């Protein structure tokens, strides 16, 4: 059976990444999908090869659904997680966002990182060159200390974990996306 590749957080991924993902033998796209199927439309006919799943990683139900989906689509050789660390910060001209908005956004980033990385590790066969990539969006000039701190945490987490993953014959890395799409 063909190995599955998961792209999680598709709503914040550049379209070029999604187009490239369609070259995978069994692409599975997960995230908060628009009701009007705009992502599928933008990707054209090739998007019919992919599985599309509405997954809200910020909820226990969404996390459980994703973990079940990972187990049901074995073997898994590729996981790409897009984290939107720049979703929090300032409203308008340097007016800070309310704490009740910042905390859930920061929690969503940390929970998604932990849930997806542990889930991916659990379903990937050691020694198969399976990989997980964490994509971080460009914080840009409007980056807040929280944005920068979350990005630094994700990067450091991946660096520390990648050593352990390498010992198992797996790969874990971070890619910093720059705005352009």
Where are these regions (language model features)?
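Structural motif
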Residues: 4-6, 78, 131
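Conserved mid-core segment of classical short-chain dehydrogenase/reductases
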Residues: 51-107
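Catalytic loop of short-chain dehydrogenase/reductase
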Residues: 9, 16, 85-168, 175-178
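A short helix-to-beta-strand connector/capping loop
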Residues: 41-53, 168-172
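Hydrophobic alpha-helical packing residues
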Residues: 20-22, 43, 161, 165
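Canonical Rossmann dinucleotide-binding motif of NAD(H)/NADP(H)-dependent dehydrogenases/reductases
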Residues: 1-37
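Structural beta-sheet core signal
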Residues: 29-30, 81, 134
């Amino acid at each position: 059976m063909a190995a599955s590749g998961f792209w999680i957080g598709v709503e914040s991924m550049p379209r070029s990444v999604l187009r490239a993902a369609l070259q995978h033998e069994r692409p599975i796209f997960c995230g908060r999908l628009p009701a009007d199927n705009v992502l599928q439309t933008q990707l054209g006919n090739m998007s019919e090869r992919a599985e599309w799943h509405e997954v809200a990683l910020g909820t226990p139900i969404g996390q459980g659904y994703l973990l079940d989906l990972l187990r049901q689509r074995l073997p898994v050789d590729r996981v790409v997680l897009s984290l939107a660390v720049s979703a929090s910060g300032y409203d308008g001209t340097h007016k800070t966002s309310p704490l009740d908005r910042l905390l859930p956004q920061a929690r969503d980033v940390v929970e998604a990182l932990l849930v997806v990385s542990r889930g991916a590790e659990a379903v990937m066969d050691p020694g198969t060159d399976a990989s997980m990539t964490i994509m971080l969006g460009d914080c840009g000039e409007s980056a807040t200390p929280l944005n920068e701190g979350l990005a630094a945490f994700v990067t450091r987490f991946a660096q520390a974990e990648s050593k352990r993953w390498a010992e198992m014959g797996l790969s874990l890395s971070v890619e910093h996306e720059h705005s352009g799409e």
